[in-house]
């Protein structure tokens, strides 16, 4: 069977008690299926102290863990602390296919990727997460949407390399929207722009990336159905005390 680590990185000052129900469910689920569960402080690695933004610091933390602690070729499921398991019969490895190393999923209510990921601890996976963490140092002076805004520009560049070189007017437009963004509406417009650039595909075997369509990923926002769930659900996001 595959070696899987579920990773939750808590920001300095946040308390496990705020997420007790979600974390309890993760602890029970990990024990049930033999997954490694790591709940860590984002101040653990000196190498990540350069990150002033706690959201990017989490991805630096993931990268350092991959380099220093987790087995090569093992898998990491990175989730927020407020994600809880509601159907423990579902397995993380059921989302994994041989030709893909990086998995994201689409949120329901807009064009957004969730900033949670399943990926492999190999050179490709480490390169991808380091690129994302390091985007903190090239953020535009705008309402940029922190790591989630950056993720969409990263994925546009990653999946459509011509968007980096200036060969694409749509790619340039997405970048300009981001650089001039003033509020969440502008961030959502930028995200929609990047998705237009990436296209209607879910599978990118040439880049070893798979994006799960709405409702097909491992988690969804709890508020969508007023905290109710079905047996089709696996994990719910936004479970707070």
Regions found by a protein language model. Name each.
Residues 14-18, 50-54, 109, 139-143, ...:
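Short amphipathic alpha-helical molecular recognition features
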Residues 41-43, 104-105, 163-170:
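Surface-exposed patches in mature extracellular/periplasmic domains of secreted proteins
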Residues 9-12, 40-43, 79-81, 105-108, ...:
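Active-site-proximal beta-strand/loop segments in catalytic clefts of secreted hydrolases
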Residues 59-60, 64, 125-241:
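Catalytic core and acceptor-binding pocket of nucleotide-sugar-dependent glycosyltransferases
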Residues 30, 82, 117, 151-152, ...:
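A residue-level signal for conserved active-site and pocket-lining positions in enzyme catalytic cores
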Residues 14-17, 38, 46-47, 84-86, ...:
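Eukaryotic short linear interaction motifs
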Residues 54-129, 134:
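GT-A fold catalytic core of metal-dependent nucleotide-sugar glycosyltransferases
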Residues 1-74, 123:
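N-terminal anchoring/stem segment of glycosyltransferases
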């Amino acid at each position: 069977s595959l070696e899987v680590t579920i990773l939750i990185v808590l920001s300095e000052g946040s308390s496990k008690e705020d997420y007790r129900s979600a974390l309890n469910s993760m602890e029970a689920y990990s024990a049930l299926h033999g997954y490694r569960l790591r709940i860590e402080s984002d101040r653990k690695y000196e190498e990540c102290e350069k990150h002033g933004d706690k959201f990017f610091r989490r991805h630096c933390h993931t990268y350092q863990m991959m380099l220093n602690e987790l087995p090569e070729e093992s898998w990491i499921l990175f989730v927020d602390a407020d994600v809880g398991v509601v159907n423990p019969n579902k397995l993380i490895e059921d989302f994994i296919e041989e030709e893909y190393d990086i998995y994201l999923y689409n949120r329901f209510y807009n064009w957004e990727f969730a900033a949670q990921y399943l990926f492999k601890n190999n050179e490709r996976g480490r390169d991808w997460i380091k690129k994302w963490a390091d985007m903190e140092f090239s953020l535009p002076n705008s309402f940029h949407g922190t790591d989630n805004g950056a993720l969409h520009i990263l994925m546009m560049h990653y999946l459509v390399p011509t968007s980096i070189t200036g060969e694409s007017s749509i790619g340039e437009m997405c970048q300009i929207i981001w650089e001039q963004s003033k509020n969440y509406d502008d961030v959502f417009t930028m995200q929609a722009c990047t998705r237009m650039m990436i296209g209607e595909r879910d599978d990118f075997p040439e880049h070893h990336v798979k994006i799960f369509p709405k409702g097909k990923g491992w988690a969804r926002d709890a508020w969508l159905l007023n905290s109710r769930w079905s047996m089709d659900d696996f994990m719910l996001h936004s479970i707070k005390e």
